[in-house]
Structures are given as structure tokens and as C-alpha cells.
A protein has these predicted regions:
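A short glycine/serine-rich beta->alpha loop
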Residues: 8, 27-29, 65-73, 103-111, ...
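Glycine- and acidic-rich phosphate- and metal-coordinating loops
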Residues: 84-109
Length: 338
């Protein structure tokens, strides 16, 4: 790509995230606990003085050049283009842009690469003079993903990558988006390994329908005694959301107390609920979680929306390398991401 020689290059880098606990509750009024990871996305942007955006990446297939006001095309570049269209509405930019994306985040691994691309693009084009906070950018990124991309996600991923710093967890109350940044204890090691689709929308719709039938705004607030009015599938989804909301709150307490054993136990309970009630795990992930714990992890669980992808494990640093070697011996195709 070529841009006018006098055009200024703007860049921004944001981390990916792993959700330690609090799955499927960011749109149900629960508290979530994502942690920023070192793998990151960097976006470089330069005005090209045309009416087209030209977007490229070494990690994602196919560069794209498209008119600045074109609709989404179901291409990875839509995440960049949605952010650029938002920026034009805010009068942050006007002409077409040359954009290059460098990503160390594995695609489809449940690490929020889409949210990271949108937030990084917004940060790159945000004028220094704009009174726009990172929280504002997170809300804008969610709106872009909901409306331009068409994914009915919650706010967790955008807040995590906009505000998070590697080595800290974000205790986020999704009712009002109040949050607390918590340092991860030095005696804890979080490891993520990798082994999406319309099923996310289906599970989300089931949660919303369960809340409607029970008569509550937030499913996390539902009384477990009222699950009898739901059919079996909706009752299972509600049971997970209610119990996961309580686990997340307990996990924040355990993190503050540096109680690794309790935190790990909550992770295991979370995975079991995601497997049995939310029905978003798969046999290969279940075995990986079981082996991770069998070999000495305090806890492990599937992370992200589910249906494969990644697990996250809590491991004593003193046994980390031996534990990883033994787990790799049982599952040769896994990759250690962080």
C-alpha cells in the first residue's frame, strides 16, 4: 500500500484477553473477571486521500480495498472498517485510510481478536484533543460489533482489551460497567492453550428468553426456585447463569485473598456448569481440562464462548514447566499461548 508521503502514521496496540471466570453472563447482569494477556494486536493507519479504505494483514487472509461507506462484507476487515466508519461519523477522519493489522492473537481461540482489532483501530484514530475515554471506546466498539458486524455480544471483551494491562484482572460489573483492576498474585500462573459460529446467538437468545419467562431484567438475578416454569433447555441455561454469577463474585474475593485453591475450585465448577448446563463444551476440551487438573493445576476451564477453542488453567509456578511437559505428552497438538 502507498500513501501520500506527508500523511501521518498513527498506531495503537491493545492486548487480548482470557476470561478467568464469568462465562455467558456479561449480557445477563453478572460480574465477569477477564485478564489481559501479552499477545496483542497493533493497528497502523495512514490517510490515503482517496474514497477507499485499503486494509491488509500478514496474519489474516486477503487484503481488502473498499469504498469508505460500503456495508459489511463478512470479511475480517469489517472489524477495521466498522471502526473507521464510526470515526468518520465523529469527524476524527474524513478520507480513505491505509490500514495494516499485525496480530499475535490466534484467530478463533476465544481471545477476543475481533474486539482487539476494533478497539485498536479506534485508539489509533482517536484525536489527542478528543475528550473520549477508553471506556467510551469500549462502548463504541460494542456498538460496532452489534450493528455493523451483526454479532450480539456483551461488553466484556471490549472493556477488557480497552482497559486491561497484562498481569491484571478486570472485575467488571456488567450492570453499570463499574470495575476494579486487580493485580494477579506473583504465586499464580495463568496458562491458556488452544486445541465460531451461530451457536453463540442461539445460547444468547435462550438466556434472554429464560429471563423473559421468569420475569426478570437480568437472568443473574433470577430465583432458582422459579426455574420450574422453564422447559429443560432454558432451565439449564438459567441454572448456569445464576450459579456462574455467584461463582464470579466468589472468585473476586478469592483473588483479593490470593486463595489459589478456592479460585481453582471455582474454575472447575464453572467448567462443569458450562459443560452440563450451558452445553458449550466438547469432549476434547473436557479431557484437556480433566488432564490439566489431574497433572496438578489448581483449576481449569473452557474459556470464550465455547464449542472448542481454548482452556485456561491456574498452575503453581513451581511446577509449571513439568506440568506443561506432562500435559503436552498427553495432548501433542495443544499450543501454549500465554
Amino acid at each position: 500500500m502507498t500513501s501520500p508521503q506527508n500523511a501521518i502514521m498513527h498506531s495503537a496496540t491493545v492486548p487480548c484477553r482470557v476470561n478467568l471466570i464469568g462465562e455467558w453472563i456479561d449480557f445477563n447482569g453478572g460480574t465477569v473477571l477477564p485478564m489481559a494477556l501479552a499477545p496483542s494486536v497493533t493497528v497502523d493507519i495512514q490517510a490515503n486521500q482517496t474514497t477507499s479504505d485499503r486494509i491488509s494483514s500478514a496474519q489474516f487472509e486477503g487484503a481488502q480495498g473498499v469504498a469508505i461507506d460500503a456495508p459489511a462484507t463478512h470479511h475480517w476487515a469489517d472489524y477495521v472498517r466498522g471502526a473507521l466508519q464510526y470515526a468518520r461519523k465523529q469527524a476524527w477522519i474524513s478520507t480513505g485510510q491505509d490500514v495494516h493489522v499485525e496480530s499475535a492473537i490466534p484467530v478463533g481461540a476465544g481471545l477476543s481478536s475481533s474486539a482487539a482489532i476494533i478497539v485498536a483501530t479506534l485508539k489509533a484514530v482517536r484525536p489527542p484533543s478528543a475528550s473520549v475515554t477508553d471506556t467510551d471506546l469500549a462502548f463504541a466498539a460494542k456498538d460496532i460489533e452489534n450493528t455493523f458486524i451483526g454479532v450480539p455480544c456483551g461488553i466484556m471483551d471490549q472493556m477488557a482489551v480497552a482497559l486491561g494491562k497484562p498481569g491484571t484482572a478486570l472485575a467488571l460489573d456488567t450492570r453499570d460497567c463499574s470495575y476494579e483492576l486487580l493485580d494477579m498474585p506473583a504465586s499464580w500462573t495463568i496458562v491458556q492453550r488452544a486445541l465460531s459460529d451461530g451457536r453463540y446467538r442461539m445460547r444468547r437468545d435462550e438466556c434472554l428468553e429464560a429471563a423473559r419467562q421468569i420475569g426478570t431484567e437480568f437472568l443473574c438475578d433470577a430465583n432458582p426456585d422459579k426455574l420450574g416454569v422453564l422447559d429443560q433447555a432454558l432451565a439449564s441455561r438459567a441454572r448456569h447463569v445464576i450459579s456462574e454469577g455467584k461463582r464470579s463474585q466468589e472468585a473476586v474475593v478469592a483473588l483479593r485473598a490470593e486463595d489459589r485453591a478456592r479460585f481453582g475450585h471455582l474454575m472447575i465448577e464453572s467448567h462443569n456448569s458450562l459443560r452440563d448446563d450451558m452445553d458449550v463444551s466438547v469432549p476434547g476440551i473436557d479431557q484437556l481440562v480433566a488432564d490439566a487438573v489431574d497433572l496438578g493445576a489448581n483449576g481449569a476451564r473452557i474459556t470464550g464462548a465455547g464449542f472448542g477453542g481454548c482452556i485456561v488453567a491456574l498452575v503453581d509456578p513451581a511446577i509449571l514447566e513439568e506440568w506443561w511437559r506432562d500435559l503436552k505428552a498427553r495432548h501433542s497438538k495443544i499450543e501454549r499461548i500465554a
